């Protein structure tokens, strides 16, 4: 497979695991998809601990806040020397709004080590009781 094909497959796995409800399965996928020293920059302001475990907990909190959702690539995935950028759309719409965004990822040795996320039109509800 080409670098582009590998990147497309990795982006698909990355987006899909944000919908995985089973904690053990999600953490296993996170450990396969993201590098050990993974870094995420995102705009929600929700708690985000370091590394893969921090991402796992962050996704769990988002699922509590937003319910069932999936992400789909919207358009082409542009790749260049271990970097990729693409737009995405969240399904179903949240609170009547179609939530969209764009991400830039850096991949080293087949794993995502850096993710920069921009989210459009998302207003988060109050955190659930017991949420971090």
Language model regions located:
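Solvent-exposed, amphipathic alpha-helical segments
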Residues: 6-21
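Alpha-helix boundary/capping and short turn/kink residues
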Residues: 20-24, 95
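A general structural-boundary detector
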Residues: 1, 17, 42-45, 92
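A solvent-exposed, acidic/Ser-Thr-rich amphipathic alpha-helical stretch
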Residues: 4, 8, 24-82
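Hydrophobic pocket/interface hotspot
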Residues: 14, 26, 30-31, 38, ...
């Amino acid at each position: 497979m080409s670098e582009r094909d590998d990147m497309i497959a990795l982006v698909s796995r990355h987006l899909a695991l944000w919908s995985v409800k089973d904690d053990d399965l999600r953490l296993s996928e996170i450990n396969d998809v993201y590098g050990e020293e993974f870094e995420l920059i995102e705009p929600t302001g929700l708690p985000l601990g370091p590394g893969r475990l921090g991402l796992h907990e962050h996704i769990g909190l988002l699922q509590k806040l937003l319910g069932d959702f999936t992400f789909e690539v919207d358009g082409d995935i542009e790749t260049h020397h271990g970097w990729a950028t693409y737009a995405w759309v969240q399904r179903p719409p949240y609170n009547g709004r179609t939530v969209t965004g764009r991400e830039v990822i850096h991949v080293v040795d087949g794993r995502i080590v850096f993710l920069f996320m921009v989210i459009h039109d998302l207003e988060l509800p109050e955190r659930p009781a017991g949420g971090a």
